[in-house]
Swiss-Prot record:
Its EC number is 7.2.1.1. This is Na(+)-translocating NADH-quinone reductase subunit E. It holds the Pfam family Rnf-Nqr. NCBIfam families: nqrE. Belongs to the NqrDE/RnfAE family. Signal peptide: none annotated. One of its GO terms (molecular function) is oxidoreductase activity, acting on NAD(P)H, quinone or similar compound as acceptor. The chain crosses the membrane at residues 11-31, 35-55, 86-106, 120-140, 149-169, 185-205. The keyword Translocase applies. GO terms for cellular component: Gram-negative-bacterium-type cell wall; plasma membrane. InterPro entries: NqrDE/RnfAE, NqrDE/RnfAE_oxidrdctase, NqrE. GO terms for biological process: respiratory electron transport chain; sodium ion transport. It comes from Colwellia psychrerythraea (strain 34H / ATCC BAA-681) (Vibrio psychroerythus).
């Protein structure tokens, strides 16, 4: 249990997708103007990551990993071992795209206001670097199915936390006297950098 809790906390604070690895920054900067919209997109990312990471883990270990199909094909010679890992990227993107399409249809039917607010950025989750990055890290870390579920959900919550914090700060900055040369993306980049420095302080925690 402690092992899974350690993974969960690390993915939220120490290995935050947005503020530690700077993944998914295009959506992070574009949709962080309002807290309500940021929360909606954040929840969508949590759902997609919570499903995409373990789903791709199952597919990778069962089909794509080197030697995964050897027993099924009756191969005993290591020289003839089947390795489909070169199909990982396109397979991962396909799974993510399918999950995003399902989520998009559900939001359109049950939460039309949120669907309209997210606009083009909802289908762009398909190519969100944070989603693909978490799946790639899952393979690199060789996580089990249980670890993948925790890692996916934790990564999503970490990204959601970052975008909601950014949206809250940007809403407050509307009432601030920002220099003309820094208005818009200028002050937003500076704010994101300062937030990243803040999250760096969690790096000293040993889990």
């Amino acid at each position: 249990m402690e092992h899974y809790l350690s993974i969960f906390i690390k993915t939220i604070f120490i290995e935050n997708m947005a503020l530690s690895f700077f993944l998914g920054m295009c959506t992070f900067l574009a949709v962080s103007k309002k807290v309500s919209t940021a929360i909606g997109l954040g929840v969508a990312v949590v759902v997609v990551l919570g499903l995409a990471v373990p789903a791709n883990q199952i597919i990778y270990q069962a089909i794509l990993a080197p030697g995964a199909l050897d027993s099924l094909m009756g191969i005993t010679d290591p020289k003839e071992s089947i390795d489909l890992s070169f199909l990982s990227f396109i397979t991962f993107i396909g799974v993510i795209a399918a999950l995003v399409q399902i989520l998009e249809m559900l939001l359109d039917k049950y939460f039309p206001a949120l669907y309209q607010a997210l606009g083009i950025f909802l289908p762009l989750i398909t190519v969100n670097c944070a989603i693909f990055g978490a799946v790639s890290f899952m393979v690199a870390k060789n996580l089990t199915l249980g670890e993948s579920v925790v890692y996916g959900v934790g990564s999503g919550i970490g990204w959601m936390l970052a975008i909601v914090l950014m949206a809250g700060l940007r809403e407050k900055m509307k009432y601030s006297d920002v220099p003309n040369g820094l208005k818009g993306l200028g002050i937003t980049f500076i704010t994101a950098g300062l937030m990243a420095f803040g999250f760096l302080s969690f790096g000293g925690i040993s889990l």
